[in-house]
C-alpha cells in the first residue's frame, strides 16, 4: 500500500544566493618592507603576544639600512682617511724640521685617536654579539621543526663553546652520550635544551631569586624612598650584567644600554597581562594584610619587578627559545619572597624588642 503524496509547498520569497567572499588585491613587498616583516605564529593567544614582542625585539636589534646611514658611513671613512694622511704628513714634516714638540703632540694625538677607535670597535663587537644572539634563536626555532641531520649538533656545540662549557662538563657529557646517529636536528636540539641548557638556566634563576630577595628586603626595612630607588636601579643593572655573563655575552656601554632598553620594551608590551595571568588569582586568594605589613607588601612588589626584569633578561640572552614548561613563572618567585620575608621580618622585630 503506497503512502499518499504530500501537498506541494510554495515559497513566497526567492532563494538567496550565497555571498561570495571579497578577495583583496595582490600586494607586493619591497626590500625595506620585507626586512620589517615577521610571520605570525599559529599558536595560542598567550603565545601570539610573545611572538609579537619577539618580532619587535628582532626589529629593534636589526640595524636599519638607509641611504643616509650609508652616506654618513662613507663620510666618516673619508674623514678618517684624511686625518690619517694629514697626521703622516705632520709627522714627516716635524721629523725633517726636528720640531720635537709638534712631533710629540702629533704622536699623543694619534695614540688618543687609536684608543678611541679601539673602544668603538670593541663596543661594536659586543653589540654585534648581542644582535647575533637573536639570530641564533631564530636558527634554533628553525632547527626545532627540521627533520634534517647534521646541523643540530654543530649548532649546539657552538652554543656550548660560547657558554664556556668544556668537554668535561657533566651536562655536556650526558648530552653527547644520549646522541645517536638516527637523531635528526630537532631531536638533537631538544636534547641539548633538556640536558645542557638547564645548567645555565638554574644559575640564572638562582641569581634572580637572590637579587629579588635583596630588593624586597631593602624596600621592606628601609624608610628612605630615594635610597630604595637608587639601590633597586643599581641592583637591577647588576642583575642584567650577571645574567648576560652567565650566557656568554660580554656587555659594553652601548650593548648594556641596548639590552636594558629591550628588556623594558619587552616588559611594557607583555608585562601587565602576564603579571595578572601568573600572579593575580593566586595573589587575590590570600589575605596579605593579615600576614605582612604594608611595607612588606611593597617589598614583595619591588622583588617581583626585579624578578620580572631578570626573566626577560634571560629570554633575551638565551640562545634557545623557551620550550613547553621551561619558562620561569613569577608565582614561583613570589612564594619564595613571601617565605623569606615571613622568616626574616619577625626575627628583626624580636631582636628590636
From Swiss-Prot:
It comes from the Bacteria. One of its GO terms (cellular component) is plasma membrane. It is a multi-pass membrane protein. It is found in: Cell inner membrane. InterPro entries: DUF697 (IPR021147), UPF0283 (IPR006507). The chain crosses the membrane at residues 71-91, 101-121, 214-234. Keywords: Cell inner membrane, Cell membrane, Membrane, Transmembrane, Transmembrane helix. Belongs to the UPF0283 family. This is UPF0283 membrane protein YpsIP31758_1791.
Amino acid at each position: 500500500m503506497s503512502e499518499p503524496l504530500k501537498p506541494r509547498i510554495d515559497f513566497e520569497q526567492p532563494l538567496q544566493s550565497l555571498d561570495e567572499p571579497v578577495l583583496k588585491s595582490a600586494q607586493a613587498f619591497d626590500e625595506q618592507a620585507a626586512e620589517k616583516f615577521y610571520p605570525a605564529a599559529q599558536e595560542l593567544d598567550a603565545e601570539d603576544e610573545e611572538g609579537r614582542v619577539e618580532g619587535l625585539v628582532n626589529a629593534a636589534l636589526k640595524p636599519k639600512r638607509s641611504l643616509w646611514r650609508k652616506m654618513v658611513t662613507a663620510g666618516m671613512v673619508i674623514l678618517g682617511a684624511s686625518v690619517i694622511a694629514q697626521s703622516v704628513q705632520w709627522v714627516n714634516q716635524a721629523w725633517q724640521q726636528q720640531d720635537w714638540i709638534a712631533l710629540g703632540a702629533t704622536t699623543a694625538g694619534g695614540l688618543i685617536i687609536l684608543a678611541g677607535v679601539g673602544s668603538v670597535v670593541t663596543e661594536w663587537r659586543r653589540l654585534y654579539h648581542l644582535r647575533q644572539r637573536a639570530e641564533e634563536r631564530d636558527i634554533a626555532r628553525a632547527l626545532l621543526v627540521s627533520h634534517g641531520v647534521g646541523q643540530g649538533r654543530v649548532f649546539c656545540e657552538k652554543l656550548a663553546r660560547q657558554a664556556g662549557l668544556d668537554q668535561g662538563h657533566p651536562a655536556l657529557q650526558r648530552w653527547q652520550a644520549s646522541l645517536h646517529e638516527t637523531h635528526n636536528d630537532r631531536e638533537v636540539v631538544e636534547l641539548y635544551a633538556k640536558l645542557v641548557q638547564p645548567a645555565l638556566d638554574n644559575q640564572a634563576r638562582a641569581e634572580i631569586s637572590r637579587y629579588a630577595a635583596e630588593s624586597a628586603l631593602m624596600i621592606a626595612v628601609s624608610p628612605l624612598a630615594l635610597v630604595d630607588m637608587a639601590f633597586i636601579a643599581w641592583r637591577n643593572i647588576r642583575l642584567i650584567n650577571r645574567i648576560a655573563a652567565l650566557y656568554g655575552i660580554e656587555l659594553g656601554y652601548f650593548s648594556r644600554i641596548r639590552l636594558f632598553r629591550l628588556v623594558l620594551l619587552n616588559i611594557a608590551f607583555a608585562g601587565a597581562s602576564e603579571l595578572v595571568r601568573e600572579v593575580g588569582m593566586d595573589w587575590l586568594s590570600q589575605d596579605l594584610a593579615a600576614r605582612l605589613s604594608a611595607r612588606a607588601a611593597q617589598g614583595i612588589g619591588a622583588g617581583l619587578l626585579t624578578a620580572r626584569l631578570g626573566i626577560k633578561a634571560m629570554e633575551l640572552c638565551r640562545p634557545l627559545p623557551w620550550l613547553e614548561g621551561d619558562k620561569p613563572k613569577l608565582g614561583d618567585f613570589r612564594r619564595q619572597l613571601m617565605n623569606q620575608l615571613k622568616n626574616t621580618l619577625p626575627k628583626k622585630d624580636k631582636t628590636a624588642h
